[in-house]
């Protein structure tokens, strides 16, 4: 009776209380995933005409909506044209965000964007305020469709002589959207099921086109806006400068590390010529930025290659983009904080600007949560599935950072491990901080008192 009364009291308090933007975003992604799951379980979605079981459909719908790319089976051989179309819609919704698509309909209907919608837009685009959010949303829509269209046109023209116009058009559209949204899904299974882009590892047009789409999609919408204004580097915001510097540094370092550890590995880069090694080393660095396309066998990577891949996957792309992971600026803030503390400084600075303590704490919170979740997931997968710890960690980080690369272990995961990967993909796309603040924390209020401080032994 007491439990029932407490529930009724909580329910009455919630009546009439509007949902926060964080809860709206998290709930909307969950609804989209469930709708996608229902569509994928229909017999018409399967290439064989048989109904797909619920768990694999849920796994695939979550992977598509959360723009990850992990899947228990080959996309082309499992899904019909209808099923692939459902996946494409889920990828677009998940990559651009449901608010972008909703805003498109608002613009088409010539309706006004209300305050609540602006708040949700700002949260979805990782903005600190609502100023200029509608204009930025227009830029996101126009820029995204334009870039995807250019990528689709290039790929269609390139594939046309080899596959015919209709198939080339579908390949161009699907892979352009998948690459730009950093999803990693491919429909090249008619060439070799489950091979991803390995059949194109000697094709610079395909790899460089998809790589460019991945990089642009992972920069973030705020960065696009500043780049479109053609400002000099010094006049750009600190955020944009950090994103550009971090992206360039991560791409170059990932390229160098991949070539270093895989150069003589005959199962990956070792059997290629100089040009092939450099091309595939660069594409591996790009795809680790949460893209999920594989031009080399990820399961054949050396232990050093897998360890480096885990680190780069964990960092991910930039905030307000189609990519996942810790985010580039979060990683940079952590490095700047470490550098400041090692020098005995109490403030964190970048480009002669001080970073607020709250944002430093947010970065530390996200990083700590991601690392702990990654290691817990690896241990859980090892305990429930016949997978080595390195491959389990690779799989857990790939899901949590919405990368989509796999060392060949996705198909051998147990049911509990698959459920964990589904949760990790969802957490990775919505954001650990968004979920914690939206659902786990109570109403934000001023602290009425603090306990007395105490000193501990640290280090």
What are the roles of these predicted feature ranges?
Residues 1-459:
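Membrane-proximal intracellular helices of multi-pass ion channels
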């Amino acid at each position: 009776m007491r439990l029932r009364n407490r529930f009724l009291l909580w329910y009455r308090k919630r009546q009439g209380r509007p949902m926060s933007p964080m809860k709206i975003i998290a709930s909307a992604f969950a609804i989209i995933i469930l709708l996608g799951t229902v569509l994928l379980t229909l017999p018409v979605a399967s290439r064989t005409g048989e109904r797909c079981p619920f768990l694999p459909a849920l796994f695939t719908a979550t992977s598509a909506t959360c723009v990850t790319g992990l899947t228990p089976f080959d996309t082309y051989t499992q899904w019909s044209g209808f099923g692939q179309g459902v996946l494409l819609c889920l990828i677009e919704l998940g990559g651009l965000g449901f608010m972008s698509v909703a805003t498109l309909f608002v613009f088409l209907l010539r309706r006004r964007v209300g305050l609540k919608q602006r708040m949700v837009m700002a949260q979805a685009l990782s903005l600190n305020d609502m100023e200029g959010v509608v204009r930025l949303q227009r830029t996101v829509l126009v820029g995204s469709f334009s870039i995807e269209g250019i990528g689709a046109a290039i790929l269609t023209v390139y594939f046309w002589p080899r596959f015919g116009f209709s198939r080339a058009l579908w390949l161009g559209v699907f892979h352009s959207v998948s690459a730009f949204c950093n999803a990693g899904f491919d429909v090249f299974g008619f060439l070799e099921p489950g091979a991803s882009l390995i059949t194109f590892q000697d094709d610079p047009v395909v790899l460089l086109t998809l790589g460019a789409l991945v990089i642009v999609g992972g920069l973030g919408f705020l960065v696009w806006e500043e780049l479109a204004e053609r400002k000099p580097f010094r006049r750009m915001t600190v955020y944009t400068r950090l994103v550009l510097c971090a992206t360039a540094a991560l791409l170059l370092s990932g390229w160098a590390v991949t070539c270093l550890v895989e150069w003589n590995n005959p199962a990956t880069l070792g059997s290629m010529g100089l040009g092939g090694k450099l091309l595939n080393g660069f594409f591996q660095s790009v795809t680790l930025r949460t893209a999920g396309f594989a031009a080399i066998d990820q399961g054949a990577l050396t232990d050093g290659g897998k360890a480096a891949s885990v680190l780069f996957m964990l960092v991910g792309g930039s905030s307000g983009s189609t990519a996942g992971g810790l985010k580039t600026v979060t990683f940079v803030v952590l490095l700047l904080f470490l550098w400041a503390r090692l020098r005995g400084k109490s403030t964190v600075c970048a480009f002669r600007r001080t970073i607020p303590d709250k944002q430093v704490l947010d970065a530390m919170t996200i990083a700590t949560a991601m690392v702990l979740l990654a290691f817990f997931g690896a241990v859980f997968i090892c305990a429930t599935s016949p997978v080595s710890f390195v491959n389990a960690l690779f799989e857990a980080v790939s899901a949590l950072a919405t990368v989509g690369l796999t060392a060949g272990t996705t198909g051998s995961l147990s049911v509990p491990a698959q459920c964990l990967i589904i949760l990790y993909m969802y957490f990775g796309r919505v954001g650990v901080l968004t979920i914690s603040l939206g659902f786990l924390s109570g109403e934000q209020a001023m602290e009425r008192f603090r306990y007395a401080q105490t000193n501990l032994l640290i280090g």
